[in-house]
């Protein structure tokens, strides 16, 4: 019998979509089901990338599947006897998947399976009658850092280089932008086009660190002189920026433009689903002493939660 493993749920798709509105903990089954249908019909595909499918297969079968692909955007990976792909890619190669895999998808993501089968053209009555799977908890483990927090949402570990993990992260914008340079993975993030002052938090460091003398991009963990004065000025700048932001919104200004006045200390939240080989690369680079302190703390937290295996060393660069 084929070994098949899945990570995620119907709700996982909804969470990764609703994070755009900072409402990823909100649950309403009927609305959730309608949202899955809406995402599918309107080709909002990224939330489907956080559900992962792995099944045992011979490498020859995987190569045969790849040879039949006509869509160059589809990504299907092979590692240590298992095929890995996310649900978005599975939908795009649906006719090539083994029937047993489709049956497991039906069991694990029943609402989503119903939507896939109807290509989104499913009426409310039938949609509401479908089972709906939920995550057992918002996070399995959570670690606070000086600038935010990270939670382990889920993991699929088969002792391969392509084991998968999903995290939810809250951090300053400048940390998120560094984070998203790690491109082998999937992201969904709070959008300030949608969310106004209901999600408006800022990171304020305890002190302003000194610039490193020999490393142009690094700092020394010592306060500069008059650090307290500058921290106070930053607080004032944040306060003035928020006031201006709110004034623009109150006058009917678009949030997508008003957000431009908010400083980089503003926090964001995002979901990150990542394979082990990319995760290990993140840990290697971001625990280095030259990495920024704030993101280094997150990398150390990840290492504490799921360990480091060194799979990234297989890459030359």
UniProtKB/Swiss-Prot annotation:
Purpose of the protein: Catalyzes the reductive methylation of 2'-deoxyuridine-5'-monophosphate (dUMP) to 2'-deoxythymidine-5'-monophosphate (dTMP) while utilizing 5,10-methylenetetrahydrofolate (mTHF) as the methyl donor, and NADPH and FADH(2) as the reductant.
UniProt cofactor(s): FAD
Name of the protein in its database record: Flavin-dependent thymidylate synthase
Pathways per UniProt: Pyrimidine metabolism; dTTP biosynthesis
Enzyme Commission designation: 2.1.1.148
Catalytic reaction equation(s): dUMP + (6R)-5,10-methylene-5,6,7,8-tetrahydrofolate + NADPH + H(+) = dTMP + (6S)-5,6,7,8-tetrahydrofolate + NADP(+)
Keywords tagged on the record: FAD, Flavoprotein, Methyltransferase, NADP, Nucleotide biosynthesis, Transferase
Quaternary organization: Homotetramer.
């Amino acid at each position: 019998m084929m070994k098949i493993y899945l990570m995620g749920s119907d709700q996982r798709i909804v969470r990764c979509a609703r994070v755009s509105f900072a409402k990823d903990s909100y649950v309403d089954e009927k609305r959730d089901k309608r949202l899955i249908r809406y995402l599918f019909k309107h080709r909002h595909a990224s939330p489907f990338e956080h559900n992962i499918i792995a099944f045992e297969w011979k490498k020859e079968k995987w190569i045969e599947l790849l040879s039949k692909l006509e869509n160059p955007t589809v990504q299907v990976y092979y590692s240590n006897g298992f095929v890995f792909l996310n649900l978005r890619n599975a939908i795009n190669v649906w006719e090539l998947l083994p029937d047993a895999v489709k049956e497991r998808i039906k069991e694990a993501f029943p609402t989503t399976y119903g939507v896939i089968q109807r290509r989104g053209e499913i009426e409310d009555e039938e949609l509401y009658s479908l089972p709906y799977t939920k995550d057992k908890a918002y996070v399995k483990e959570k670690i606070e850092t000086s600038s935010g927090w990270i939670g382990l949402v889920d993991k699929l570990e088969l002792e391969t280089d392509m084991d998968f993990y999903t995290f939810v992260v809250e951090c300053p914008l400048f940390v998120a932008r560094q984070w998203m340079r790690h491109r082998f993975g999937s992201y969904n993030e709070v959008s300030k086009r949608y969310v106004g002052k209901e999600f408006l938090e800022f990171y304020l460091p305890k002190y302003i660190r000194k610039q490193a003398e020999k490393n142009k991009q690094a700092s020394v963990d010592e306060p500069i002189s008059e650090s307290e004065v500058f921290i106070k000025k930053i607080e004032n700048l944040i306060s003035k920026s928020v006031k201006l932001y709110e004034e623009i919104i109150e006058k009917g200004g678009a949030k997508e433009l008003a957000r431009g006045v908010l400083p980089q200390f503003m926090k964001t939240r995002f979901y990150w689903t990542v394979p082990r080989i990319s995760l290990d690369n993140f840990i290697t680079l971001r625990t280095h002493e030259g990495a920024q302190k704030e993101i280094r703390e997150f990398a150390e937290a990840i290492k504490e939660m799921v360990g480091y295996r060194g799979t990234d060393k297989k890459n030359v660069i």
